[in-house]
Amino acid sequence: MSHIIYEPVKQRLQRSELAVPGSSPNMFEKALKSGADFVFLDLEDAVAPDDKVKARKNVIDALQDLDWQGNGKTISVRINSIDTHYMYRDVVEVVEQAGEHLDTILLPKAGTASDVYMLSAMLNQIETSKGFKHQIGIEVLIETTLGMANVVDIAKYGREERLEAMHFGVADYAASCRARTTVIGGLNPNYPGDQWHAGLSQMLVACRAYGIRPIDGPFGDFNDPESYKDAARRGAALGFEGKWAIHPSQIELANEIYTPPESEVSHAKQILIALDEAAKEGRGAAQLNGRMIDAASAKMAENIVNTDNAINGKVVA
């Protein structure tokens, strides 16, 4: 192993991530009481141009008036992208007026590490001037070919500028690639396998190398729960920590898939016990149920046990 190890920047439980349009305040209370681990109030794609200013006011009110953290939620706001004239006001107005209640900001269409730096610099100034006692984190959407081409640099340099998590924005990524698909997160039957696997894997490796949380993005057809679960299983198998829910019906599906089964947790604990006993006897490896286990097995087992502990409120994952 290299002598350089990048520890996780910030650990949060993020199995399910509920998207809530900032222009629909009637949905805020429902999101607060939902089973989602993470909620983001959206000022970007879910809000029509004529509604942007009103949506921003709605989001500020929701952050000020509702106790998101007290209801077990990580609360975030997706601002508009840097190439729009909305982004500056999104950051300044939301953070100055309600930043004390905000956990993270979700930056869409991140293309380079400098995009993260720009947002971080704005947050530094606002937090200092307002005297905030906590630091707001940054999460980015990788949803363009430029962002995917620079994903390693974004993770590497972004971690020094508040970056906590990356999300795979499959819809805009598909458009950027000119992929032949019209269902958000859906698969083209002419492609053998999962056409998003390469992008997901590339982003995942960058995240894990530099201690950033990898989060899978949306699946558009909320009337097709089985396909949603299939996509979530693929992400979980790769090592993602959670998936978006663009409809409340998808929350429990994400929670189910990204919660390790009891049998998996039990087996992981058995691995750790067996290796602990082997270590006491001076052995680096052991056998469990007819299979060899070693230090690598312990690391995989610890990941499962830590996730289970976080879900049950014992420790942070």
Question: Positions of the model-derived regions?
Answer:
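Expand to "…catalyze enediolate/carbanion chemistry for C-C bond making/breaking, isomerization
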Residues: 1-317
